[in-house]
């Protein structure tokens, strides 16, 4: 896992060049969840498994999002979500009940379908299916979360001194392939003196300050939008015990 985190850091610093590194390896570097083993023999079983219904709030959001986008074409995703969340909170219980009742009805249908579906499976198939569903759920949850955070404009994490150096030197580095270029940059970094590295250390510290300031602003927006679930754990704890947020 440490290796994967290290590679992600380098690729983030490279931007498009990082994608080239992956292409040179034959495929893009996957997220850690992509390496979860999924038994292929049950893929067709999972494909025919009934899908869970979406929540009442998600139904409302999906219904309202196109409307809000059409009315506010230049609005940021965070602003749209904030407005939809506000509208949902202010929605009368009688109107919320429409979405809640629709969800309950779909959930009942889902339970009946999943019950009939499991009756057709052997015990070993059920065990393997449950494992595959969990694995796919974790992978999908991670991908969805990452996509959502990108759409919501979550600030990019600060770069290390080494990643700052890679971003600056990669294009001009010697090598016929992206892998060779990266190897050259890595060796050059190792050969830098402490005084030469000082510049990149300073830039990395500045980037860390940038990240802290942007995260503070972003999390304030998420609190206003009713998305406290996206806050960092330390911020959640401070809010829970009534301490200052920062």
Swiss-Prot record:
Transmembrane segments: none annotated. The modification Phosphoserine is found at residues 55-56, 61, 160, 193, 195. It comes from the Eukaryota. The keyword Lyase does not apply. The lineage of its organism: Eukaryota, Metazoa, Chordata, Craniata, Vertebrata. Residues 50-118, 155-219 bind DNA. Disulfide bonds: none annotated. This is Transcription factor A, mitochondrial. Binds DNA via its HMG boxes. When bound to the mitochondrial light strand promoter, bends DNA into a U-turn shape, each HMG box bending the DNA by 90 degrees. The modification Phosphothreonine is found at residue 122. It comes from Trachypithecus cristatus (Silvered leaf-monkey).
């Amino acid at each position: 896992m440490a290796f994967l985190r290290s590679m992600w850091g380098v690729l983030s610093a490279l931007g498009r060049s990082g994608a080239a590194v992956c292409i040179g390896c034959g495929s893009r570097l996957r997220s850690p969840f992509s390496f979860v083993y999924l038994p292929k023999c049950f893929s067709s079983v999972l494909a025919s498994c009934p899908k869970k219904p979406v929540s009442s709030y998600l139904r409302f959001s999906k219904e309202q999002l196109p409307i809000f986008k059409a009315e506010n074409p230049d609005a940021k995703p965070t602003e749209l979500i904030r407005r939809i969340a506000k509208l949902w909170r202010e929605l009368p219980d009688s109107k919320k009940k429409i979405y809640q009742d629709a969800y309950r009805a779909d959930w009942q249908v889902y339970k009946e379908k999943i019950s009939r579906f499991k009756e057709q499976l052997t015990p070993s198939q059920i065990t393997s299916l449950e494992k595959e569903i969990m694995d796919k759920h974790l992978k999908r949850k991670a991908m969805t979360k990452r996509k959502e955070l990108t759409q919501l404009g979550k600030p990019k994490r600060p770069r290390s001194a080494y990643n700052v150096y890679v971003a600056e030197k990669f294009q001009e580095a010697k090598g016929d392939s992206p892998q060779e270029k990266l190897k050259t940059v890595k060796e050059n970094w190792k050969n830098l003196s402490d005084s030469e590295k000082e510049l990149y250390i300073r830039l990395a510290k500045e980037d860390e300050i940038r990240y802290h300031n942007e995260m503070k602003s972003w999390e304030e927006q998420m609190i206003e939008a009713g998305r406290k679930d996206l806050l960092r754990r330390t911020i959640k704890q401070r809010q829970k015990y009534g301490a200052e947020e920062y």
